[in-house]
Regions:
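The canonical Cys-X-X-Cys-His
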Residues: 119-130
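Absolute protein N-terminus
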Residues: 1, 23-25, 132
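Inter-heme linker and motif-flanking segments adjacent to c-type heme-binding CXXCH motifs
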Residues: 107, 129-132
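Extracytoplasmic c-type cytochrome modules immediately beyond a signal peptide or single-pass transmembrane anchor
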Residues: 20-118
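Bacterial N-terminal signal peptides that target proteins for export
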Residues: 1-11
Length: 132
């Protein structure tokens, strides 16, 4: 019962934060900082997956929030580059974040490792095309 309550509250907080940030018109730099900077969700998930016994509950919360941020990213306007490229690349990022979330929810370490590896390789192409 306590575990269910904890997960319910954690999920509510995650989605509330995502909704709040979206309502505030969060820009791409803020999304990227929350997701990828040192101490951000992506590095936390990477570190968590390297643990001998991953804390799947924490990883689930972090991956849920990463998917929320990836969703907001796709709805943002890039500082440069065309809209079609942005739509394709941001959808790819969202798809990989969702694959990571799915693997973590299934406590599938190999799947999560593969998904986070693919997610890590998505940065360069998008930054070349769309980052100032």
């Amino acid at each position: 019962m306590k575990i269910t309550t904890f997960f319910s509250i954690a999920t509510l907080v995650t989605f509330s934060l995502g909704a709040f940030l979206f309502a505030q018109g969060v820009d791409i730099k803020e999304i990227m900082a929350k997701a990828n900077k040192a101490g951000g969700l992506f590095p936390q998930i990477q570190k968590g997956l390297k643990a001998p016994a991953p804390n799947w509950a924490n990883l689930k919360n972090d991956s849920d929030e990463l998917v929320s941020l990836a969703t907001m990213l796709g709805k943002s306007k890039p500082p440069k580059g065309d809209a079609a490229s942005w739509a394709t690349m941001s959808k790819g990022y969202l798809d990989e974040a969702t694959a990571l979330k799915t693997a973590i929810a299934a406590m599938n370490k190999a799947g999560a490792d593969a998904a986070i590896g693919k997610l890590a390789t998505s940065c360069t192409g998008c930054h070349k095309a769309h980052k100032n």
